[in-house]
Amino acid sequence: MSENYRAPIVVVVGHVDVGKTLLLDKIRNTMVAYREPGMITQHIGLSYLPWPIIEKYAAPVIERYRLKGKVWVKGFLMVDTPGHAAFSNLRRRGGSVADLAILVIDLTRGFEEQTYESLILLKSRNIPFVVAANKVDRIYGWKPIPNASILDSYNAQDEETQGRLEEALANIIMDFNKQGFEAERFDRITDFSRQVPIVPTSAVTGEGIPDLLVLMAGLTQRLVKDRLRLVGGPGKGVVMEVKEEKGLGTTMDVVLYDGVMRKGDTIVAMGLNGPVVTRIRMMVMPKPLDEMRDPEDKYMHINEVEAAAGVKVIADGLDDVVPGSSVYVVQGDPKPYIDEVVKDAASVKIETDQIGVVAKADTLGTLEAMVLYLRSQGIPVRKADIGPVTRRDIIDASVVRRKNPLYGVVLAFNVKVPKEVEEEAKVQLVTIFQNNILYRLVEEFTKWFNEEKSRLIESELSKYVRPGKIAIIPGYVFRRSDPAIVGVEVLGGLIKPGYRLVKANGKEVGVIMQIQDKGKPIQVAKKGMSVAISIEGNVIVGRHIKEGDVLYVNVPLEHAVKLIMQYKDHLSSDEVEVLEEFMKLRSTWKAQAQ
């Protein structure tokens, strides 16, 4: 059965500090302890875990579910680097090279920022995933049983400890429900195609890891079988990383997911400045651990590699290649392959005339993930491209800034901003946001956006007379006229110097000259404040106005219409109430005048 199928590629994702690396290390190290010589093979960026080793390690779980002899999965190719960047680069148009994901969630903390980010990415790339609810050993009162099935460990705990675990799981299940997913503890799942299985694990004690690996084999056979069928022919892969290696020059780490790649083959990948067509001079893979005598001499040369595999490719012109790009082995005319990589890159890059931010990222994969996340947060994108921030990006952002200052910015994810570009940004008044963690970058921008929006709206609102309602406080008449000085309570809205006051019957009272609070002049008094005001105009307290009278700010009609039609959402609820009350009074004055 397994002959025409490759091993599934598995990626580990989740929030920072949830134990992704520790979990991966625990799985790998435990496997090493069970291995026979030559069984575990190290790839570039991937570790191959053969099923026979898993079978030994997870024997009690396999026995419990009577799976002996029923699993045809060869093993798992685990992506060595956990997290978003690696997962983002495991991309191909319309999906992912990863077949399965482990979403690690801290059992004691539940959903966190990057949990949501991971879910958006998994959903968009349509990848089945299993949840490792990690740090079960941190549950108060938990008595660990190293490397045991989580069900055996669970049954060995007292009732109170079991209850604490159930409560933590219930919170995670609730978080999934809020995101539109149905989730359940793995042994209670009734439909794996609809429900998300959760396995409590500990990267420290190894508990739950046997269940996790057996569950992954089951999901592979049930949900991703067709993805694993090998078509054969010329190799197809994705570029994970491009880096300088001592003694080798610029190298390209490739995950080959179909076909064959040979030394001497012509390959096509996408570069920063267009397609790169080159010939493979050399391919290397890591030596088996037991053959690695010298850290400097860690690679073995290979002439041919079959999918699925992780391989380091050495060729000319690789400096320009973009991680996350597709890579194809050329057979015959290279043009169709060139068209394909161009089309692939174009599906990620964006250039429009619309109002939106300029997004820059270091790889095609991270750019794709970035645009996806920005859109999920309701942030429009005008331009998305790879590489350091350039002067051209600043000009593009400044064009947007002139139309909408809130979106005329550059978001730089994991890329450099040259000094001269920073200077240009200062001249053009363009703000650059820079961070290596996507959600923090978006968080910084959103915080600035909201503050800037409030500032701009306040600046716009300052052009209009705002609604206000005051009552003259009995016993607080300091001067009867020329100007009248009285103590007032602001019943709703606000008052400012220069605002005209009217009575409820429409009679003009005068203009507020000054507002004082505890003897000091202030520029604005809001609802709930008691202040002294001086009123200029032909007004005498006791004749034109009396103690206890309610007065209104006389909002000009065009201001009132603008405030209601355009800025209602930005006024406080008491301002809206006073404005509506004032408009009703105003309509009665009009009727009386007729």
UniProtKB/Swiss-Prot annotation:
GO cellular component: cytoplasm
One Pfam family here: IF-2
UniProt keyword annotations, A-Z: GTP-binding, Initiation factor, Nucleotide-binding, Protein biosynthesis
InterPro entries per record: EFTu-like_2 (IPR004161), EFTU-type (IPR029459), P-loop_NTPase (IPR027417), Small_GTP-bd (IPR005225), T_Tr_GTP-bd_dom (IPR000795), TF_aIF-2_arc (IPR004544), TIF_IF2 (IPR015760), TIF_IF2_dom3 (IPR023115)
Region ranges (G2): 39-43
tr-type G domain ranges (all copies): 5-224
Residues binding GTP, per UniProt: 14-21, 80-84, 134-137
Claim: tRNA processing is one of the keywords in the record: no
GO molecular-function terms, A-Z: GTP binding; GTPase activity; translation initiation factor activity
Annotated region described as G4, given as residue ranges: 134-137
SUPFAM superfamilies xrefs: Initiation factor IF2/eIF5b, domain 3, P-loop containing nucleoside triphosphate hydrolases, Translation proteins
Region of interest called G5, as start-end residue ranges on this chain: 202-204
Entry function: Function in general translation initiation by promoting the binding of the formylmethionine-tRNA to ribosomes. Seems to function along with eIF-2.
Family, similarity comment: Belongs to the TRAFAC class translation factor GTPase superfamily. Classic translation factor GTPase family. IF-2 subfamily.
Name under which the protein is recorded: Probable translation initiation factor IF-2
Source organism: Caldivirga maquilingensis (strain ATCC 700844 / DSM 13496 / JCM 10307 / IC-167)
Gene: infB
